[in-house]
Amino acid sequence: MAGPQRRGSGAGGGERRDRKGRDGGASAAEKTAYVERVVAINRVAKVVKGGRRFSFTALVVVGDGDGTVGVGYGKAKEVPAAIAKGVEEAKKNFFKVPRIQGTIPHPITGEKAAGVVLLKPASPGTGVIAGGPVRAVLECAGVHDILSKSLGSSNAINIVHATVAALQGLQRPEEIAARRGLPLEDVAPAALLRARAGAGA
């Protein structure tokens, strides 16, 4: 009698392990739905009565690689916890980036604090011509062809926020045409017109 009971208990444990494994797999799939880039990790200190208390900060960029991106800043006593907080904040700061065939609709300059970043559209096949912090934001946003140049501070935090400011300032050709009272053909890039013509054909 004891033998069958042990086998039954083992089977039940196996089922529980299987269920746990399936649940864990689902959560892992959800986590990999976004592209995450850790741009900078710094150790900071707070002076208290007993001495100095150290913690870590993490600047994280998260996006879906298809026009949605956000930036977050996390702080914790351990690096993994700081990164996790940064990821959660980045998801709360998601915004949409207008794109045309993998690039941006028009040139734009973004400024934040001492950071200044210039972004220019590029033809297909150019790739992402950008430094580390700018590249992280653009790749997470799903921009594949672009030219960029940092004109201000070399601080990674300022550069990332200047890049975000530039992307948030982008306007769709339809919005520009409506504001100016002009036909779309007068303001839209040639790439957009070719893409629409091809889709119509």
Curated annotation (Swiss-Prot):
InterPro entries in the record: Ribosomal_Su5_D2-typ_SF, Ribosomal_uS5, Ribosomal_uS5_bac-type, Ribosomal_uS5_C, Ribosomal_uS5_N, Ribosomal_uS5_N_CS, Ribsml_uS5_D2-typ_fold_subgr
Any single GO BP term: translation
GO cellular component, one term: small ribosomal subunit
Domain S5 DRBM per the UniProt entry, residue ranges: 34-97
Chain residue ranges for the region called Disordered: 1-28
Presence of the UniProt keyword Cell division in the record: no
GO molecular function list: rRNA binding; structural constituent of ribosome
Keyword annotations from UniProtKB, A to Z: Ribonucleoprotein, Ribosomal protein, RNA-binding, rRNA-binding
Comp. bias intervals (Basic and acidic residues): 14-23
NCBIfam families referenced in this protein's UniProt entry, alphabetically: rpsE_bact
Assembly with partners or alone: Part of the 30S ribosomal subunit. Contacts proteins S4 and S8.
Sequence similarity: Belongs to the universal ribosomal protein uS5 family.
Job description of the protein: With S4 and S12 plays an important role in translational accuracy.
Domain statement: The N-terminal domain interacts with the head of the 30S subunit; the C-terminal domain interacts with the body and contacts protein S4. The interaction surface between S4 and S5 is involved in control of translational fidelity.
Protein name, as recorded: Small ribosomal subunit protein uS5
Native organism: Streptomyces griseus subsp. griseus (strain JCM 4626 / CBS 651.72 / NBRC 13350 / KCC S-0626 / ISP 5235)
